[in-house]
Amino acid sequence: MVNPPQPRQMPKSPRLSTSTSSGPSAVPNLLGSPRPSPPQLQHQPSSASTSSTTSTATTGGSISATAPGSTQHYLHHHPSRKTSIVEILSSPPPLPTDPNDPIHQLSLSRHASTSSNKSSSQSIAPGSTAITNHAFSLVDWSEIPLTELTESNKLISIHSSHSVQSAFETLLKNNLTSVPVSISKSDPHDLTNCLTFDYSDLNTYLLLIMNKINYSELNVDDIGDPNISPQERHEFVTQTISKAKRGEEVPVEFIIKLHPKNPFIKFNETDTLFSVMETLGNGVHRIAITNEEGNKITGILSQRRLIKYMWENARRFPSLDFYLTSTLQDLKIGSSNPITIYEDQMLIEALHKMFNERVSSLAVIDRSRTLIGNISIVDVKNVTSSKNSHLLFKSVLNFISYNLSQKGIEEGQDQFPIFHVNNQTSLGRVIAKLVATQSHRLWIVDSSRQASSMSSASASAPNSGMNNGVTVGYPAPADSSITDKAEEVEASSMSSPQLNAAAAAAAAVATGAPTTATSAQPDFSYTSGTGKLVGVVTLTDILGLFATSKGRRTDPQAARNQRRRSSTSTTRSSIDSALSAEGILPSGSAIIGSSNAANTGRRGSVEVSSDVFRKSYTKAQENAFSKE
C-alpha cells in the first residue's frame, strides 16, 4: 500500500516569525499526519460566529490562526526528508494571493529609500491590517452559494431550428462539450425550457447516416406532432434521416430527441452546493443555474467544473481532508466492471458501443485486458470530415495513434495523458489527475498483474514510469509505442492468409459478424503497459462520495439507468409493434437511405456517408462536414 502523501514543506520566511509571536502557527494541512477521523455523515450548517479557524495566504503558502483547543492540524514539517513528486502532485493548489498583500510592495531596488524601508517594515509588522483583511475563513463547502460558481461570461446558446452542422460548429468554435438549445417559438434566446446538444448527439447523427442504428434503438416518442399516428411518425423519422444522408440540413432538435438524456435540472443561484452535489453525484452531467426570479438561466454547472472548483478551493474545506488523503480502496468507490473495447476492433464499433451503453468513454484494452488507452465520445469530432472518414474502419488503436500525433502537432510535443490510477492512489491524486486531464473518469489498473512479456520488458526498461505502484509524470506507453503497435496491428490485418484484407473486412461487416477473439490479430507484446484493467472511478463517484458525507443518498448509476430506460421505453416498443403489425417496420430492420435494406456493410456505409462528408452546407472552409 502506498503511504499517505506527506505535505510540502513551508519555506522559512521572516514574515512568519514576526507575525506569529503568540506561539507556533498551525498551517492548514490537507495531507498531514496524524490523519483526521472521518467526519460525521450529516449536514451541519456552519456560521461565521462558530468559525474558529482562519487562514492567511503568504508567498510560501497559507497559514492559519487556530483557536485554542483546536485539534485541526494540517501540515507538519519534516526537516529530515524532502517532499516527493507524488506528494506535491497530490496536494491541492494554494489559495489565491491578494495582490494588495504588503509582501508584494517590497522594493527590489538596491538603494531603497528610508521611507520605503520604513513603510515596508511597518506593513510587515504583527497585526497588520492588510494581513487581517486577507484572511480566508475555512468554511463548509455545502454552504457555498451557487453565485460563487456562476461565471460572468456570456452564456452561449443556439435555437432548436439550427442545423446539426451549425450546432457542431458552435461546440468547436467555443471549445465546448455541450450547448443549451432553446425551444421557444417566440424568443430564440429564451432558455426557460431548453434542451442540450453535445457530442453524444453528433455521434448519433454519424451512426444514423452510416446505417448503424436500428429504428428500434431510437427514442421517437417526442418526434413530430404528438397527435400523429405511428405510421406517420415512422415516415417523418425516416424521411428526415434520408435528408441527412443526402447531405441536407437537419434541425438539431430532431437529433437531440432521438438520443435520450436526463431532464435539464435547474437550480436557483441562491441555492447552495448541498443539493447540487446530490444531483451531480447521482450521475447528472450538468445542471442549469437561474437568477433569483427563476426566469433566466445565468450559467451551466457541469460535473467537471464542480470538481475543479472543489479541488482549487480544497484548502478552504477542512471536511475534505479525510477523503483527500484516503485511498480508493479505503473509500470503496468506483466500479469494478468498466465498459471496454478491444484495441483491434474498428472505431465505428466503439462509437456504436458508446451509443448503446449510453456512456461517453471506453477503456481500450488488449486481449489480456491490459489497459492500452482511452477513447472518448468527444473524439467523434475527428472523423466528421471526408479526409478522416476512413479511420472509422481502422482499429481503435490506430485512431488513438492518430489522436496523439495530432495533439503533438498542435501542441508541439509528444504527450500521453495519464488516464489510469490504482486502488492505492489517494483521492487527492485522483482528483488532481482528473482536473489536469479534463477527464470524466480514470481507469483503475492492477500493475502487479501485467502479462509476463510486459514484466520482463519493463524490468529491462530504465524508465518504466512506475514507483511502488504509483505512476509518476508521463509514463509509457509513449507515442512511438502506440504508433508502432498500431502499424503492426494494421499490417497483420492486411496479410490474412485466407483472403484479401479489404474483402475480408467488408465481408465481415456486411454479414454483421462481430469481431471475436478468433479473428483477433496476433499477440504483439505491449512492452510499456500500465497493468490489468480492474475498474473505473468517475466524477460521479467522487461527487457522490462528497454528497454522502453530508447525509445524502446517491446512486452513481441512477442517471445512466434512466437514460437506458428512456431508450427502451414501452411506449416506443408499442409503436414498433404497431408498425410491424402493419408491415411497415420489419423486426430489427435498420434505417436506410436506399432500396437495399440489408446492406449495412462496410462498403455500403462508406458510400452513404460520403454525401454527408462532402456536401457543402455553407462555405466549405467553415463547414466541418464538407470535404477538406
Swiss-Prot record:
SUPFAM superfamilies: CBS-domain pair
Polar residues: compositionally biased ranges: 15-24
Induction, per UniProt: By the antifungal drug fluconazole.
Keyword terms: CBS domain, Cytoplasm, Nucleus, Repeat
BP term (GO), one: cellular response to glucose starvation
Pfam family, one: CBS
Cell compartments where the protein resides: Cytoplasm; Nucleus
Region (Disordered): 1-126, 551-609
Biased composition (Low complexity): 40-71, 109-123, 587-599
GO molecular function: protein serine/threonine phosphatase inhibitor activity
Domain CBS positions: 258-319, 334-392
GO annotations of cellular component type: cytoplasm; nucleus
Role summary: Involved in DNA replication and cell separation.
Family assignment from sequence similarity: Belongs to the SDS23 family.
Protein name: Protein SDS23
Organism for this UniProt entry: Candida albicans (strain SC5314 / ATCC MYA-2876)
Name of the gene encoding the protein in the UniProt record: SDS24
